[in-house]
Amino acid sequence: FLLCFFLVADVSYGINKDCLLPMDVGRCRARHPRYYYNSSSKRCEMFNYGGCRGNANNFITKKECEKVCGVRSRDSPKEN
């Protein structure tokens, strides 16, 4: 039990809780390009939002997703 707790805590520490929600296209049938934080790949990825419902892991731009979810862009210099 403790090992599982620490593994989950390590992955999610410091990340906005909304960013840990699963991608949710919503119930409507529109196709609005949006971005969500994929906690498996640790990147913001595009998806087609249906236009209603869904959840808070839904960003209009990739830049907004990266800012809110703390994702470093590939162009950022790495810390030593």
UniProtKB/Swiss-Prot annotation:
One of its GO terms (molecular function) is serine-type endopeptidase inhibitor activity. Keywords: Disulfide bond, Ion channel impairing toxin, Nematocyst, Potassium channel impairing toxin, Protease inhibitor, Secreted, Serine protease inhibitor, Signal, Toxin, Voltage-gated potassium channel impairing toxin. It comes from the Eukaryota. Pfam families: Kunitz_BPTI. Disulfide bonds join 19-69, 28-52, 44-65. One of its GO terms (cellular component) is nematocyst. Residues 19-69 form the BPTI/Kunitz inhibitor domain. InterPro entries: Kunitz_BPTI, Kunitz_BPTI_sf, Prtase_inh_Kunz-CS, TFPI/VKTCI-like. Residues 1-14 form the signal peptide. The keyword Glycosyltransferase does not apply. The record marks 29-30 as: Reactive bond. Residues 74-80 form a propeptide. It is found in: Secreted; Nematocyst. Belongs to the venom Kunitz-type family. Sea anemone type 2 potassium channel toxin subfamily. Serine protease inhibitor that inhibits both tissue and plasma kallikreins. Has hemolytic activity. Inhibits voltage-gated potassium channels (Kv). This is U-actitoxin-Avd3s.
